[in-house]
């Protein structure tokens, strides 16, 4: 609020010209949360798992922190793949699950989606993948229609591993292809060439036993509208159930980030990435695929994308594995990232916690409603604040700049607005927090 007790919307206006924002902004995790003291972690965890679940959907996330190679763009690399280390990790991961599976919290509500992330979950052996999936199905209350996603890559994801996942109960595969172009794949340190990646995806689809989805990245070095269009056409023609189109996020600590900083390579500008995204949206629309969220498209009814949708809606998430993060009943936590420390905690029969954060807000659900609304391009602002009309000048300006379909307080994003969704989310998050603050706080000079 300014000195006249009116909301200053101008810092959130879109810029003049072809590009409404300088770059895409990112929302920070644990925003507004209070850390639990280190000496209170164990006690707090016991209190958490002895409480029943809140009336929300529930998810499970498992982190597999091993990769055979370090892709140049990836900021999630933790540990190099080793067969013995993976087998040992599986033993400990199952122990972590079993340690708390019988708790009040874990048994108090059905689980609607399970996600194996990493790292590279498909690097585990067929036997170990089956063991983990079987443990989850036997020990936790998975819903009958629970979505069980295995994230993987082409390298080493052989028929034995795939069939072991399917036989154990996995029903969705998400494969990080990123690009089918052999030259671009080589620059990213992807070991398989384009034809090999295509053949792998085709073989996965032909099994016809699970939803098959692939990730494609836009904004990669050497990528242009032509190569991007070729990737989109291949994804369309393979027979996939769904596809994810993600913008490359250049992280300073990655090999690619360092190469960009040193001038050894270049990546498309924000405006060029925007154009590639719009190209992808138009292509998927012309192909008849339905837009599930800002980055996800489905071709068949098999593809539900439950985990990604529900996590944006504020679903509770149980988390297992080194580096895994979860949230439940107003608390968020992160497991130990250091593999040795994680192993030592599990071996001692302790939850391998690195930190726990407590949400300071009494009612934070509006943030989840906002986030999920932006993610699906429809934000009913009147349901988030009784003062939505105060946002009218901003909504009108965004509409004028092509970010929304109209200027109403039910914000409906265009494809342009979808690309800049993180900026819109950040602005609305800040503004609604001010609008919903007690009047005495809004009136402070």
UniProtKB/Swiss-Prot annotation:
EC number: 2.1.1.342
Cofactor note: Binds 1 [4Fe-4S] cluster. The cluster is coordinated with 3 cysteines and an exchangeable S-adenosyl-L-methionine.
Species for this entry: Escherichia coli O157:H7
Cellular component GO terms held in the UniProt record: cytoplasm
Notes on activation and inhibition: Inhibited by exposure to molecular oxygen.
Catalytic activity reported: 2 reduced [flavodoxin] + heme b + 2 S-adenosyl-L-methionine = anaerobilin + 2 oxidized [flavodoxin] + Fe(2+) + 5'-deoxyadenosine + L-methionine + S-adenosyl-L-homocysteine
Keyword Iron in record: yes
Protein's name according to its UniProt entry: Anaerobilin synthase
Binding residues for [4Fe-4S] cluster: 67, 71, 74
CDD domains noted in UniProt: Radical_SAM (cd01335)
Domain Radical SAM core residues, every copy: 52-287
Gene giving rise to this polypeptide: chuW
Binding site for S-adenosyl-L-methionine 1: 61, 118, 151
InterPro entries assigned to the protein according to its UniProt record, in alphabetical order: Aldolase_TIM, Coproporphyrinogen-III_oxidase, Elp3/MiaA/NifB-like_rSAM, HutW, rSAM
Source taxon at top rank: Bacteria
GO molecular function: 4 iron, 4 sulfur cluster binding; metal ion binding; methyltransferase activity
UniProt entry keywords in alphabetical sequence: 4Fe-4S, Iron, Iron-sulfur, Metal-binding, Methyltransferase, S-adenosyl-L-methionine, Transferase
One of the protein's GO biological processes: methylation
Protein family according to the UniProt entry: Belongs to the anaerobic coproporphyrinogen-III oxidase family. ChuW/HutW subfamily.
Record-listed S-adenosyl-L-methionine 2 binding positions: 73, 119-120, 178, 190, 215
Cofactors required: [4Fe-4S] cluster
Main enzyme class: transferase
Job description of the protein: Involved in heme degradation and iron utilization under anaerobic conditions. Catalyzes a radical-mediated mechanism facilitating iron liberation and the production of the tetrapyrrole product anaerobilin. Can use heme, mesoheme and deuteroheme as substrates.
């Amino acid at each position: 609020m300014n000195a006249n007790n009116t909301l200053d919307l101008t810092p959130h206006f879109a810029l003049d010209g072809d590009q409404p924002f300088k770059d895409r902004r990112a929302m920070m995790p644990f925003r507004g949360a209070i850390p639990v003291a280190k000496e209170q972690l164990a006690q707090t965890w016991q209190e958490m798992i002895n409480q029943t679940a809140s009336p929300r959907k529930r998810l499970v996330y498992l982190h597999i922190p091993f990769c055979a190679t370090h892709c140049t763009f990836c900021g999630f690399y933790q540990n190099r793949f080793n067969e013995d280390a993976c087998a040992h990790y599986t033993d400990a991961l199952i122990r972590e699950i079993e340690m708390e599976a019988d708790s009040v919290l874990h048994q108090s509500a059905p689980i609607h989606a399970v996600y194996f992330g990493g790292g590279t979950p498909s690097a585990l052996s067929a036997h170990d993948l089956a063991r983990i999936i079987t443990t989850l199905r036997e020990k936790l209350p998975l819903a009958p229609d629970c979505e069980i996603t295995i994230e993987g890559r082409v390298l080493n994801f052989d028929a034995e591993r795939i069939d072991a996942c399917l036989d154990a109960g996995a029903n969705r595969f998400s494969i990080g292809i990123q690009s089918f172009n052999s030259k671009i794949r080589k620059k990213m340190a992807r070991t398989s060439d384009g034809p090999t990646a295509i053949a792998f995806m085709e073989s996965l689809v032909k099994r016809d036993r699970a939803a098959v989805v692939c990730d494609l990245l836009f904004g990669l070095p050497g990528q242009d509208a032509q190569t991007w269009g070729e990737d989109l056409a291949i994804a369309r023609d393979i027979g996939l159930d769904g596809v994810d189109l993600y913008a490359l996020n250049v992280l300073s600590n990655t090999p690619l980030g360092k190469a960009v900083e040193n001038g050894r390579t270049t990546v498309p500008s924000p405006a060029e990435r925007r154009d590639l995204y719009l190209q992808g949206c138009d292509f998927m629309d012309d192909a008849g695929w339905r837009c599930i969220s800002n980055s996800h498209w489905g071709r068949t009814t098999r593809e539900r994308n439950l985990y990604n949708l529900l996590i944006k809606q504020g679903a509770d998430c149980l988390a297992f594995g080194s580096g895994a993060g979860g949230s439940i009943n107003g608390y968020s936590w992160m497991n130990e990232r250091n593999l040795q420390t994680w192993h030592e905690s599990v071996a001692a029969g302790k939850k391998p916690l690195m930190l726990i954060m407590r949400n300071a807000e009494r009612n934070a659900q509006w943030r989840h409603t906002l986030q999920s609304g932006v993610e699906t391009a429809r934000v009913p602002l009147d349901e988030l604040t009784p003062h939505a009309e105060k946002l009218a000048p901003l909504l009108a300006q965004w509409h004028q700049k092509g970010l929304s379909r109209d200027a109403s307080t039910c914000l409906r994003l265009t494809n342009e607005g979808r690309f800049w969704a993180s900026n819109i989310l950040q602005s609305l998050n800040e503004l609604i927090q001010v609008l919903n603050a007690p009047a005495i706080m809004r009136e402070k000079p």
